[in-house]
């Protein structure tokens, strides 16, 4: 089942934290609030997400795009070009995520 998460607010009440990143990306325990929300839904079998991002959406998109780079061991083989990058021991989540503007 798809779960829609509204993540486009400005975070005005926590402006000292949200000045540089959107509210869903403020970290708690080393992970963004958005990750904690998704983990909660995932616990109950909801693993397909549509994230409606607005304010600073590029930060949310970058976080998901770089997820494996942050959470896995990586070998960069510069002798054969960028396409020969190997991600070892991938830390996977059972999620399918779509980030919309």
Question: Which residues does each predicted region cover?
Answer:
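Conserved N-terminal catalytic core of the sugar/cofactor nucleotidyltransferase
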Residues: 2-5, 13, 31-101
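Short acidic/histidine- and often glycine-rich active-site loop of Leloir-type glycosyltransferases
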Residues: 16-17
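Short catalytic helix/loop segments, enriched in acidic residues and glycine
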Residues: 20-35
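Active-site glycine-centered loops adjacent to acidic/histidine catalytic or metal-binding residues
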Residues: 9
